[in-house]
Amino acid sequence: MSDKTYLTKGGYNKLKDELDDLKTNVRQQVLEKITEAKSHGDLSENAEYEAAKEEQAQVESRISTLERVLSTATILDEKDIKTDKVYILTTVLLKDLDRDEEVEYTLVSSEEADSENGKISVKSPIGKNLLGKSVGEIVEIKVPKGIMRYEVLNIKVK
């Protein structure tokens, strides 16, 4: 079950840098913590050892995830993205019809999502409902707080 991941060149490089750091620095630091904890004797009641082993499991899991994502990634070039409809890597200007406010989102992969900077995942409720929409269309999105209604005002590539 390998889902294809679409990334910008910058997003790919960021994940690759994280992977390299985990493999070359973080992994070694965790091994040093394990070695240090082992030197304290009895492992059956060694909280420091257990914490280091848990950290090691988390690091190895993240390494595995990043390797999978990067191996299935397709790097998208923004100049090839169309703006006739909402696609991944398009920036969408929306009018919130309930609050009469405008909001702008850029649709990205889950790995590049950053809601504080207006980057939302295409797998999020908003992202899923925006995909394929055109300027002028009304989008109704079910969210935990109810239904949000937006009008698509503009689609562009930043």
From Swiss-Prot:
Q: Pfam families recorded for this chain? A: GreA_GreB, GreA_GreB_N
Residue runs in coiled coils? 8-74
GO MF assignments: DNA binding; RNA polymerase binding
Tell me which domain of life the UniProt entry assigns to the organism this sequence originates from. Answer: Bacteria
Keyword Repeat found: no
Sorted alphabetically, which keywords does the UniProt record give?
Coiled coil, DNA-binding, Transcription, Transcription regulation
Q: Does the keyword DNA-binding apply?
A: yes
What's an example Gene Ontology biological process for this entry? regulation of DNA-templated transcription elongation
Write out the similarity annotation: Belongs to the GreA/GreB family.
- What's the stated role of this polypeptide? Necessary for efficient RNA polymerase transcription elongation past template-encoded arresting sites. The arresting sites in DNA have the property of trapping a certain fraction of elongating RNA polymerases that pass through, resulting in locked ternary complexes. Cleavage of the nascent transcript by cleavage factors such as GreA or GreB allows the resumption of elongation from the new 3'terminus. GreA releases sequences of 2 to 3 nucleotides.
Q: What is this protein called?
A: Transcription elongation factor GreA
Q: Taxonomically, what lineage is the organism?
A: Bacteria, Pseudomonadati, Chlorobiota, Chlorobiia, Chlorobiales
